[in-house]
Amino acid sequence: MSSLPEAKLDVLLAHHASLEAESLGQLASERYVQITRELAEITPLIEAVKTYRSAVKELADTEALIADPATDAEMRGMAEAERDELAPRIEDLVQKIRVALLPKDAMDDRNVVLEIRAGTGGDEASLFAGDLFRMYERFASLQGWKVEVISASEGTVGGYKEIIAEVQGRGAFSKLKFESGVHRVQRVPDTETQGRIHTSAATVAVLPEVEDVDVDIKNDDLRIETMRAQGAGGQHVNKTESAIRITHIPTGIVVMMQDSRSQHKNRASAMNILRSRIYDAERQRVDAARSAERKEKVGSGDRSERIRTYNFPQGRVTDHRINLTLYKLPQVIAGEALGELIDALTTEHQAAQLAAQGAAA
């Protein structure tokens, strides 16, 4: 039977009891909200630990009964059946607790900056980028999250050449972080008269929304340019210099924002995206260094990595990182079955973390 860090479990149980006792006292509203949130987060783990310890005690009592020479054959048979039922239940609880004890990504509860760009495939790629955005928008709605478009460049026949949106909701990054990469679509375009299947692609980037304290950006490292916003064909669409282009000189990261008529709002949006991109670039650099010797199955999150194929003629979606195929393309692209892919990716990632812990032990 797999072992658990019993001393750590004792500390968690004591901490939970302390929080419950404190919650019954007179508290400032801010502290009450903080305690309530923490209790909601750790109570499922605490309940699993209590159930596990109760089952372990029950198993020990059962095995003692089986080993007792005074136990008659009928009672021993019943005890053996109970033991055979308890053992796998305890193993399941151990696995559940080990997963719950895994280190949490500090960004998991953050909002998300979602960037989708049409790749190879011309107009079809733009249409597919639009399909992906609506898929995430619907998925977010089902989670009770809010989606706000920050910037959008529409395709000539529909969809988007590029769209950037903020996904606001608790746990948004934890759910969407494995969506970064190249998404490929195979389907027959409406304009295709001979029924040939075309392949096109779009790139998705999921960045945790970060704050000033998360990223140190010096004013001297920024080059800020203002200009008049441009519409299709390059013509100027207003007479004031409301568009903003910000370059982070050390990294070369550039963000341009012109969707609002307000220069102040464009600058705030551009800085928000810039912070997230700088943080993400550093995060990827650190992750790459950590996994140089061990390639994780879930994938590196590299923007150039093809992660998923949506095959419309066959009605299937294949995630290449975990070799999972679902014949539920309409439900996935509608955002309704996307959670099945996300859950499978999360499980695979947790398994990789547990394996790494075991190798390090």
UniProtKB/Swiss-Prot annotation:
InterPro entries: PCRF, Pep_chain_release_fac_I, Pep_chain_release_fac_I_sf, Prokaryotic/Mito_RF, RF-1. The modification N5-methylglutamine is found at residue 235. One of its GO terms (cellular component) is cytoplasm. Keywords: Cytoplasm, Methylation, Protein biosynthesis. Pfam families: PCRF, RF-1. SUPFAM superfamilies: Release factor (SSF75620). Residues 284-305 are annotated as: Disordered. It comes from the Bacteria. Methylated by PrmC. Methylation increases the termination efficiency of RF1. It is found in: Cytoplasm. One of its GO terms (molecular function) is translation release factor activity, codon specific. The keyword Metal-binding does not apply. Its main location: cytoplasm. Peptide chain release factor 1 directs the termination of translation in response to the peptide chain termination codons UAG and UAA. HAMAP family: Rel_fac_1. Belongs to the prokaryotic/mitochondrial release factor family. PANTHER family: LD18447P. This is Peptide chain release factor 1. It comes from Bradyrhizobium diazoefficiens (strain JCM 10833 / BCRC 13528 / IAM 13628 / NBRC 14792 / USDA 110). The lineage of its organism: Bacteria, Pseudomonadati, Pseudomonadota, Alphaproteobacteria, Hyphomicrobiales.
